[in-house]
A protein has these predicted regions:
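Sec-dependent bacterial lipoprotein signal peptides
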Residues: 1-30
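Compositionally biased regions
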Residues: 5-6, 31, 136, 141, ...
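Bacterial Sec-dependent N-terminal signal peptides
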Residues: 25-59, 178, 277, 282, ...
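Generic recognition of cysteine residues
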Residues: 31, 74, 80, 84, ...
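Primarily secretory-pathway and cell-envelope proteins
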Residues: 31-77, 128-190, 194-196
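Structured interaction patches on ligand/partner-binding surfaces of diverse proteins
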Residues: 33, 95-99, 124-164, 260-290
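A structural detector for beta-sheet-dominated domains
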Residues: 52-54, 82, 95, 111, ...
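Tryptophan-paired
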Residues: 71-131, 188-278, 310-318
Length: 318
């Protein structure tokens, strides 16, 4: 850029447009930071760029298709563009819900230079907190905290040229599934609570790893007492010990609550392994012996079966 005040007044801009359409990819859809040059000359001082969020990768646990449209899976999108080095303006965050007529399409003018761009799709009831590009977190108005979440992050070198950036979001979460074999949930139970630690409620979209050591909680109101399946999510987190870097296991406390708020049944699942894009499934009779009983359960080996990337199965002991 020139140094004169006239040239400073004609600072080049970059137009960011996110559109759900197929286009020739000029950007590798990954969650690792890369710098991408975009190449069709346009009018001086303007840099229009189209970013197309056209699919999610890794979505195979409920369907056989490996790639699906973002609107089929997630109800919320957040796009965040971060300033170039030395710029004083704050990040620009644009949030959308599936109900928005323009879901998947946004426009924004930006300056020439290298910008970090992060895209997050999720099913939470609040927008993602994206102040730190390397630690995205989620709040909650109710009990929906960590939901199935997909990310893309990269660096785009905005020049006097234009092009299309195709974005395929990648799953960042692991799922824990409790599969009950009880004939029915006891009538006095009105809520099932999952309190778990060892995972993370925040994620680095560049590495897809959890960034915080979190205590997480999810609650399910029991309206159908024949319900068998309960699912919660976390961002797997690594810990270093004795020079080795290993995934942190979860400790999960599952508590049945009655209408008066009393805990009438509780089980503690210890040392539960979770991995990104995998389901860890625990199957068994949760209410064996009736209510008002507390049991600690330890888990050992894993059995793996392909479902997401795979399912790790445990049997709930009597």
């Amino acid at each position: 850029m020139g140094q004169s005040s006239a040239l400073m007044k004609t600072k080049r801009e970059f137009v960011l447009i996110v559109a759900t359409m197929l286009a020739i990819p000029v950007l590798v859809a990954s969650c690792h930071a890369r710098i991408h040059e975009l190449t069709d000359p346009v009018d001086k001082g303007k840099v229009p760029v189209t970013i197309s969020v056209n699919s999610l990768s890794g979505y195979s646990y409920a369907q056989t298709r490996a790639m699906v449209d973002v609107g089929e899976v997630c109800s919320n999108l957040s796009f965040c563009i971060y300033p170039c080095d030395g710029e004083s303006f704050d990040k620009i965050q644009i949030n959308q819900t599936r109900e928005d007529p323009s879901f998947g399409t946004v426009s924004q003018n930006l300056t020439v230079g290298v910008h970090k761009i992060v895209v997050v799709a999720h099913n939470g009831d609040k927008n993602a907190t994206m102040t730190n590009s390397e630690s995205i977190s989620f709040g909650s108005n109710t009990v929906l905290k960590t939901t199935d979440t997909f990310c893309w992050a990269g660096e785009v070198n905005v020049t006097q040229e234009t092009g299309t950036v195709n974005v395929a979001l990648t799953r960042a979460t692991a799922m824990f599934r409790l599969n009950l074999t009880d004939s029915a949930i006891p009538a006095q139970v009105c809520e099932l609570q999952f309190a778990y630690k060892g995972g993370s409620a925040a994620v680095n979209p560049f590495t897809l790893e959890g960034t915080t050591k979190s205590n997480q909680k999810e609650s399910f109101v029991i309206q159908d007492h024949s319900r068998k399946v309960f699912e919660v999510y976390t961002f797997p987190r690594y810990e270093e010990k004795n020079g080795e870097r290993n995934l942190s296991p979860l400790e999960i406390t599952v508590t049945a609550i009655d209408i008066y708020g009393n805990a009438v049944k509780e089980r503690v699942l210890e040392n539960v392994s979770v991995n990104r894009n995998r389901i860890t499934e625990c199957t068994g009779e949760f209410f064996a012996g009736g209510c008002l009983e507390y049991t600690n359960i330890g888990f050992g080996g894993l059995q793996v079966e392909e479902d997401w990337a795979g399912t790790d199965n445990y049997t709930l002991p009597d």
